[in-house]
Regions:
Chain B
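Juxtamembrane/interface alpha-helical elements of multi-pass membrane proteins
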Residues: 73-186
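Transmembrane alpha-helix interface motif
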Residues: 1-42, 48-57, 144, 148-151, ...
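Alpha-helical transmembrane segments and their helix-start/interface "positive-inside/aromatic belt" motifs
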Residues: 25, 64-74, 248
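Alpha-helical transmembrane segments and their membrane-interface exit regions
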Residues: 51-61, 76-79
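Loop-to-transmembrane-helix entry motif
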Residues: 69-73, 77, 113, 117, ...
Length: 281, 271
C-alpha cells in the first residue's frame, strides 16, 4: 500500500531577512512498507518527525531525497498529486481547522465536490460516510455545535467520502476528551476491519497503539523501533529511553516481573495481566 | 461583548420564502431597494410597505423579531431625521430659539425615516430567510458572467463562506484570550477610550497570530481534500430554478412596474 525508500526531508531554516541560513533534517533515511488493510500506529515524542512523515504520504510535502509510493503512485510526480491525495486521505489534529462546511453534510461533500463527482453520487457518498462514523443524525447541524470527538468523526467522514484506500491520521485525538478519543479510535477501527481501509495513526496515547497491527517508533527523524505492539511494549527500558511511555498495565507487569513475579513481558491489557497473575498461582 | 451582533442572522423555520431560490431573493432585495428610491410619495411608500408586509407574512418570521433588529439603527434614524427636520429651508412652521421646523423639512424627514426603516427591514428579511451558504452560492452564480473578465468569482464566494464559518470560532477565541488576559490583570472595563483602545492591542496580536495559523492549517486541509479552485468542481447542492421561482420573478416585475408608474404618473392628490 505504502512504500517508503530511503526518505530524507530537510526543512530550510531562514534568518530574519528570509535568506536560507541552514537546514534541519526532519526525516533521516526512512524506509518502511505498509501492507494493504493494516492498522499502523506511529509513535514518537514531539519533534521526532512523525507529522512530517505523515505529510509525505499525502503529497503535502515532497522528499528531499528518496521516494514515497502510495498504492504504486510516486509522490514526486506532479501529475499524480490529486490521485495520491484521493488515495491517501488525511485527518489533522485540530478539528476546527479542517472543517470547511457550515453544515455537517456540506463539509462531508467538500472532497467529492472537488473531485468532480456528480451531484447524486455526492449525496450517496455523504450518506454512507456519515453512517460509517455514526454521525448521520447530525447531518443538518452546524459543526460549531458539535463536541470535539463528533467534529473529528465528521472530518473522518469527509475523508471516507472521497473513497480512499488509506487514511493517515495525524494525532486526531490530541485535543479530545477521553470519550471523544474512544469514539474516534473506534470509528477508525471499524473502517479498518469492515471496509479494509489501511489506517496510519499517529498518536502519543499508548492505549490507542496497542490495537494496531504494527507499530513504528520514531526518534530524531529515524525509525527507532518497529514491530507488533507486544514486541514494542515488551522493551520497556528502550521506550523510556526514547521519552515514551508504555501502557500503564504493561508498566505494572514489567515492574512486577522485575520484582521476581514469573509473568511474561509485553502484557497489553488488564485481562491479560489478571490471567497471567492467576496462572502464576 | 459580541452577543449583540445580529448581522446576517438566519431565522430557522420553514416557509415559502425560505424555500425560494436564493438568487431570486438577492435580485428581489435589490429590486426592492431600488424601488424605495424610485417612489417619492407617501402613497408610493405605502405600496412598498404592502409588498414588504406580504413578504413578512410569507416568511413565517415573527414581526416582533424583525422589529427588534431595528433597535440597532434607531440612533442613526434619529440623527438623520433631526438633521433633515431642522436644516431643510422652506415655509417655517415652528421656531424654537435658533431652530426652526419647516413644512418641507417635516415631510422630507418623515419620508427619509420611512425609507430607511423599510430598507433595513427589507434587507434583513433576506438574511433572516437565507442561510449564509445559500447566499454565497447565489452570489457566485449571479456573478458568473464576470468570469469572462477574469474576475475570480468562485474564489470570492469560497472566501466569503470560509469567513462566515470562522466568525463564531474567532469569537470564541477572542473570549478565551480576553479571559486569559483578565486573569493576569488586564482591564477591559475601563470607560476611558484611549485606555480601552490600548487594552485591545494585547488582545488583537494573539488573535491575529492564531487566525493566521488557522488559515495555514485550513489551506493544508483543503489541499489534502483535493481542493484546486473552481475548475472541474461539481456541486452538492446546485441551484436550479423551479416554478415558484419563476412566479416570484414575475411578481417582482409587476411590483417594480407599479412603483415606476406611481413615480411618473404624478397624480395630483399624492404628496
Amino acid at each position: 500500500m505504502i512504500k517508503i525508500s530511503r526518505l530524507i526531508h530537510d526543512y530550510i531554516q531562514r534568518d530574519e531577512e528570509g535568506n536560507p541560513s541552514g537546514t534541519i533534517r526532519a526525516l533521516d533515511d526512512i524506509s518502511l512498507d505498509v501492507e494493504p488493510g493494516q492498522f499502523i500506529a506511529i509513535l514518537g515524542h514531539n519533534g521526532s518527525g512523525k507529522s512530517t512523515l505523515a505529510k509525505h504520504l499525502n503529497a503535502l510535502l515532497f522528499p528531499t531525497e528518496g521516494a514515497v509510493w502510495v498504492n504504486g503512485l510516486d509522490t514526486r510526480d506532479q501529475n499524480l498529486i490529486w490521485d495520491i491525495r484521493q488515495t491517501a486521505g488525511m485527518v489533522f489534529q485540530n478539528p476546527d481547522n479542517q472543517i470547511i462546511g457550515q453544515v455537517v453534510e456540506e463539509d462531508v461533500g467538500f472532497g467529492p465536490e472537488n473531485m468532480g463527482v456528480p451531484t447524486q453520487e455526492i449525496w450517496n457518498r455523504v450518506e454512507e460516510s456519515l453512517k460509517a462514523v455514526g454521525m448521520y443524525e447530525y447531518r443538518k447541524k452546524s459543526p460549531n455545535r458539535l463536541s470535539g470527538g463528533q467534529k473529528q468523526r465528521v472530518s473522518i467522514a469527509g475523508v471516507i467520502a472521497m473513497h480512499p484506500r488509506c487514511i493517515v491520521m495525524d494525532e486526531p485525538t490530541a485535543m479530545l476528551d477521553p470519550s471523544g478519543r474512544a469514539d474516534v479510535i473506534n470509528a477508525a477501527m471499524t473502517l479498518n476491519r469492515e471496509e479494509g481501509i489501511t489506517i496510519i495513526l499517529i498518536t502519543h496515547y499508548m492505549e490507542e497503539a496497542i490495537r494496531a497491527d504494527r507499530i513504528f517508533v520514531m526518534d530524531e527523524g529515524k525509525v527507532a523501533m518497529q514491530g507488533t505492539p507486544r514486541e514494542i511494549f515488551s522493551r520497556v527500558e528502550e521506550m523510556q529511553a526514547l521519552h515514551l511511555d508504555v501502557p500503564q498495565v504493561t508498566l505494572l507487569a514489567h515492574t512486577l516481573r522485575q520484582r521476581g513475579l514469573s509473568i511474561p513481558e509485553g502484557i497489553l491489557t488488564r485481562e491479560e495481566l489478571a490471567e497471567a497473575l492467576l496462572g502464576g498461582n | 461583548m459580541f452577543k449583540d451582533i445580529t448581522l446576517g442572522q438566519y431565522y430557522q423555520t420553514d416557509s415559502l420564502l425560505h424555500r425560494l431560490d436564493p438568487r431570486v431573493k438577492i435580485v428581489g432585495t435589490l429590486v426592492y431597494i431600488i424601488s424605495l428610491f424610485v417612489v417619492d410619495t407617501f402613497a408610493g411608500y405605502f405600496v412598498c410597505l404592502l409588498f414588504l408586509a406580504a413578504m413578512i407574512c410569507l416568511s413565517n418570521v415573527p414581526v416582533g423579531y424583525i422589529v427588534r433588529g431595528m433597535r440597532a439603527i434607531l440612533i442613526l434614524l434619529l440623527i438623520t431625521m433631526s438633521f433633515n427636520l431642522f436644516l431643510t429651508p422652506g415655509e417655517v412652521l415652528v421656531r424654537i430659539g435658533f431652530l426652526k421646523i419647516t413644512r418641507e423639512g417635516l415631510i422630507f424627514s418623515l419620508k427619509m425615516a420611512i425609507r430607511l426603516s423599510l430598507l433595513v427591514i427589507g434587507s434583513s428579511l433576506m438574511t433572516l430567510t437565507t442561510t449564509p451558504n445559500q447566499l454565497t452560492d447565489a452570489i457566485e452564480s449571479l456573478l458568473n458572467p464576470l468570469k469572462r473578465f477574469r474576475v475570480p468569482v468562485h474564489e470570492i464566494a469560497m472566501m466569503m463562506s470560509i469567513a462566515l464559518r470562522f466568525i463564531p470560532i474567532l469569537m470564541e477565541e477572542t473570549d478565551k484570550i480576553m479571559k486569559a488576559q483578565i486573569a493576569r490583570g488586564a482591564d477591559f472595563e475601563s470607560k476611558n477610550l484611549i485606555k480601552k483602545m490600548k487594552s485591545l492591542v494585547p488582545l488583537l496580536v494573539p488573535l491575529f497570530i492564531s487566525a493566521f495559523r488557522r488559515a495555514n492549517d485550513l489551506a493544508m486541509a483543503m489541499e489534502a481534500r483535493c481542493y484546486r479552485g473552481g475548475v472541474g468542481r461539481t456541486k452538492m447542492k446546485p441551484l436550479i430554478y423551479e416554478g415558484r421561482d419563476q412566479a416570484a420573478y414575475m411578481l417582482l416585475v409587476a411590483y417594480f412596474a407599479i412603483c415606476v408608474l406611481l413615480r411618473f404618473l404624478r397624480l395630483p392628490f399624492l404628496i
